[in-house]
Design a protein with these regions (language model features):
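Short histidine-centered catalytic/ligand-binding loop motif
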Residues: 65-74, 123-135
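Non-catalytic substrate-recognition/targeting regions of SAM-dependent transferases
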Residues: 103-116, 135-206, 215
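A short, charged
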Residues: 78, 82, 86-90, 94, ...
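Rossmann-like S-adenosyl-L-methionine
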Residues: 175, 179-400
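Non-catalytic accessory regions of SAM-dependent methyltransferases
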Residues: 1-113, 117-119
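Short, surface-exposed beta-strand-loop junctions and turns on beta-sheet-rich folds
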Residues: 60, 130-132, 202-203
Length: 400
């Protein structure tokens, strides 16, 4: 059966030709041939030049997601195994693989698919209709490739409950793939133990992208008084604790997250000096300032304040406010670790916003380092959506 052909409008396809992976609905001139959403299609530019193969979904603004630039490449099990094997071999070279992101969508050339490995458990998230059809085959291939390295996967859980699926015309879903198993999974990262709730935790249960950023703050925290804002399940706070901080306070608005963080502190024998409170950070920080509290290290790891270009302006206000409040709580010569996990809060804008907050707080910033996401979340150049995490460490000085 011949594949349908998607032909782009004249002058369109520049992003695709320069390394991008997406074709938007407004770039398409015609679709010739029969198809159902989720099918593999051929992609041509306006002049008929072949650009590759991808899967189509006319319900989505991202109408075609590229799978290969070779128009003659069959999308079969052999093709998928090569993708899976390449992804695993890459991670073995660049990161600790006991717990890691095994598949990172477009950056691993499997668009719309996320797979996290937590020890001997896989958590999968499918965000595109076409990859949904291939998901089970890919998971079997992942188990095969891992088994070759002596890693037996005891269970798979699906967390396809992200709202973005609705933009693909897909239902939200979460549940077991195969036999059921306990959904609290213990992992060790940077010497810290965690209980990861893969069923009810945020996203896939744990934010693996901050792995080496958490490690980076350890050297600042010995004998320090530390405030960790938006702590989630306590990862930055616990890294501070294990590094020898004398007192750590973690703050989160979710009681579930605070309860999990408290259990994680007990798991590491740190519950005597690492404490967690359930508070709204935006309300708490002004109170701490009024009370004259000061910290050696303040960590700001907020959720994404914007998930679209249209809400960036409001997000800037949020980032400016939280950094202003955080800076005012840092002792002269202390440190601020601050980040944004929103793709739409671009590096230049985030940097500018922190600078504005520092001026308003009458603080001078000395940059210690700039970091981004862990290498198991690779940044694919020309695929801007793969670069989202911005992470700064500053020394904070009073104006002199």
């Amino acid at each position: 059966m011949s594949l349908a052909v998607v032909t782009l409008k004249k002058g369109e396809g520049r992003l695709l030709k320069s390394g991008g992976m997406w074709i938007f609905d407004n770039e398409i001139a015609t679709i010739m041939g029969s198809f159902v959403n989720g099918d593999i299609v051929l992609i041509h530019d306006f002049d008929g030049y072949p650009l590759g193969r991808g899967f189509i979904n006319t319900n989505s603004k991202i109408t075609v997601r590229l799978l290969t630039r070779d128009e003659n490449q069959k999308i079969d099990e052999e093709f998928l195994e090569k993708r899976v094997r390449d992804a695993w071999e890459y991670r073995k070279k660049v990161t600790d693989t006991s717990s890691c992101r095994m598949i990172f969508g477009e950056a691993d050339f499997l668009p719309g698919l996320v797979v996290d490995k937590f020890e001997d458990v896989l958590v999968v998230q499918s965000l595109a209709l076409g990859i949904d059809r291939l998901k089970n085959t890919i998971l079997e291939l992942l188990k095969k490739v891992l088994a070759e390295d002596g890693i037996q996967i005891r269970g798979i859980y699906e967390r396809s409950d992200a709202k973005v699926r609705k933009q693909e015309g897909m239902e939200l879903y979460k549940g077991f793939i195969g036999p059921e198993f306990p959904t609290l999974v213990e992992i060790v990262e940077n010497g810290v133990k965690y209980q990861v709730d893969i069923k009810d935790g945020q996203k896939t249960g744990f934010f693996l992208d901050q792995k080496y950023n958490r490690l980076a703050i350890q050297k600042l925290c010995k004998d320090a008084r530390v405030l960790d804002c938006f702590t989630h399940t306590g990862s930055f706070a616990l890294n501070a604790g294990i590094a020898g901080a004398k007192e750590v306070t973690g703050v989160d608005a979710s009681q579930l997250a605070v309860d999990q963080a408290t259990e994680n502190a007990k798991l590491n024998g740190l519950d005597d000096k690492v404490k967690f409170i359930c508070e709204d950070v935006f309300e708490l920080l002004p109170k701490l300032e009024e009370e004259g509290e000061k910290y050696d290290v303040v960590i700001l790891d907020p959720p994404a304040f914007t998930k679209s270009r249209s809400s960036v302006k409001n997000a800037v206000k949020g980032y400016r406010e939280i950094n202003l409040r955080g800076l005012k709580l840092v002792k002269d010569g202390g440190f601020l670790a601050t980040c944004s996990c929103s793709h739409f809060m671009e590096y230049e804008l985030f940097t500018k916003t922190i600078g504005q907050a520092a001026r308003s707080a009458h603080k001078r910033l000395r940059q210690v380092e700039y970091r981004t996401q862990a290498p198991d979340h690779p940044i694919l150049w020309a695929s801007d959506e793969s670069y989202y995490l911005k992470f700064y460490i500053f020394q904070v000085c009073d104006e002199k």
